């Protein structure tokens, strides 16, 4: 939201004038993670909307009728689903009526670099359980919307970024939004505010990234004891993140003295500084995955927080000048001509 709001404030394009933050209110505890942000946005941000969903109840009903799932699955503390039935598509279709009512033509989601994966198992190509968060899904949905005549395109402006670079940009550029972040598998209410549990894998990840970036996890509602516990369990249990991201984060935490690892491999294996750069990858984050007139101002902002920009050439990352690369002006294939052929730099000054 912070990036989109900033971009819309600078744009002279008719297609980038308003941002409509729309929250999907699940009927269960998943809603807790968004509640702090929703209350703030409802009271302070124009165009905020909310759609109520009961999809989580439906998924639970499915699980209760699967004979191979233990009956007490809801009481098992785990960072994993018994079977993943949840899908991003539920939220996307949930907001479509509001998009139609308000005349919104872009459905922007927050998927990052490591959610586009193509893998193979015994000759079977798959998406590592992340298809609904991948660029391929964005494109499939955009094609579907176009075939329906709905004039809606779907994309993410975060695909060139790692989780830690997103957190770095959030904490440095939008600290007021960082205060609203609750990324936790078991968030709970304390008086009028939702707080993270400080025990799950997501909490380890958030505490680790903020600590490595010299930011205060307490800003997101963590207590001192939760921070200490999360960092201790970061070493003991690890996190779920792309391998290079885990390596770089562990390196940064070790270097700043936040953790002590007993794994000698961390002393001999080099870090992965590319994690802190904008990464242009032909499969995961090509230039044309973002509409043309957003690229120039978006990259200008992100370069203020990233360690430069890199482009994948074969198996290596090579420095790239984002604005002079021939592919920078590649057309975005899922929008009609709204008069967006104006040069992005001219649109934003």
Give each language-model segment a name.
Residues 2-349:
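Nucleotide-activated chemistry modules centered on ATP-dependent adenylation/adenylyltransferase
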């Amino acid at each position: 939201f912070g990036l989109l709001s900033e971009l819309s404030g600078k744009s002279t394009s008719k297609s980038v004038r308003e941002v409509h933050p729309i929250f999907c209110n699940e009927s269960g505890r998943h809603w807790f993670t968004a509640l702090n942000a929703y209350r703030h946005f409802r009271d302070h941000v124009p165009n905020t909307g909310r759609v109520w969903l009961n999809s989580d109840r439906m998924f639970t009903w499915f699980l209760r009728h699967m004979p191979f799932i233990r009956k007490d699955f809801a009481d098992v503390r785990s960072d994993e689903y018994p079977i993943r039935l949840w899908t991003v598509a539920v939220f996307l279709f949930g907001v479509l009526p509001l998009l139609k009512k308000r005349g919104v033509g872009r459905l922007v989601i927050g998927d990052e670099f490591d959610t586009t994966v193509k893998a193979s198992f015994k000759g079977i190509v798959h998406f590592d359980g992340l298809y609904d968060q991948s660029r391929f899904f964005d494109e499939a949905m955009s094609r579907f919307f176009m075939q329906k005549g709905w004039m809606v395109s779907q994309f993410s402006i975060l695909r060139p970024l790692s989780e830690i670079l997103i957190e770095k940009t959030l904490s440095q550029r939008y600290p007021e939004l960082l205060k609203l972040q609750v990324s936790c598998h078991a968030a709970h209410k304390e008086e009028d505010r939702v707080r993270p549990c400080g025990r799950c894998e997501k909490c380890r990840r958030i505490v680790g990234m903020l600590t490595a970036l010299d930011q205060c996890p307490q800003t997101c509602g963590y207590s001192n004891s939760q921070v200490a516990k999360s960092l201790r369990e970061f070493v003991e249990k690890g996190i779920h993140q792309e391998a290079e991201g885990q390596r770089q984060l562990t390196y940064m935490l070790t270097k700043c003295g936040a953790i002590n690892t007993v794994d000698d491999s961390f002393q001999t294996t080099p870090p992965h500084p590319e994690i802190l750069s904008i990464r242009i990858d032909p499969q995961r984050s090509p230039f044309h995955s973002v509409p043309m007139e957003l690229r120039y101002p978006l990259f200008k902002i992100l370069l203020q927080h990233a360690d430069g920009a890199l482009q994948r050439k074969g198996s290596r990352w090579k420095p790239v000048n984002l604005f002079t690369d021939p592919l920078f002006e590649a057309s975005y294939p899922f929008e009609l001509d709204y008069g967006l052929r104006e040069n992005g730099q001219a649109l934003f000054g």
